[in-house]
Amino acid sequence: LSKIKNETAGGFLSSLASGIIPLPHQLHVLNRAMETNNIRYILADEVGLGKTIEAGMIIRELKSRGLVSRILVVCPTGLVTQWASEMQEKFHEKFQVILPSDYDTIRRLTDNDDVYGQFDQVISPMDSIKPIEKHAGWSEEKVEKYNEERIYSIINSGWDLVIMDGAHRVAGSAGEVARYKLGNLLAQASPYLLLL
């Protein structure tokens, strides 16, 4: 453990979290990601090899360097709790989870329409924020209002880092695919981007 900490101490400002003993490939990913000033990086390890840990290490390093403070994680619904608990337990990073059912409640309780702008670190499920084309019983105006409130408010919240877990799910054969639109909008929403 001390050898790993000594090897990483030379080039990194963040210290390793007490519960983290990074594997060599995770240190390699951290090194590669931090080689450039414009981090737009794909973490494409196999399932179970610790992409969330790699992302957490990159978050810690970017925060230590003062490069990010507002972070958005968008992931499949089934991974929201895992992301929140791993960031808290392993990196001591508290993220606000915003589920679809929370949106109106937060807006009412805070009397603030900028739901996502109220929190510096947010985790939200991908399918709950993707743009919709139509909805049964809704007029075009209501669909547009929904998209503006949910999707465009998250896109325009001034994120420093956007992390998309399940990025392979945004691929589509046409630019009209809702997840593709979401991925494209999120990729433009911040200077730093991690795709998992």
List each model region and its residues.
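The conserved Walker
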Residues: 47
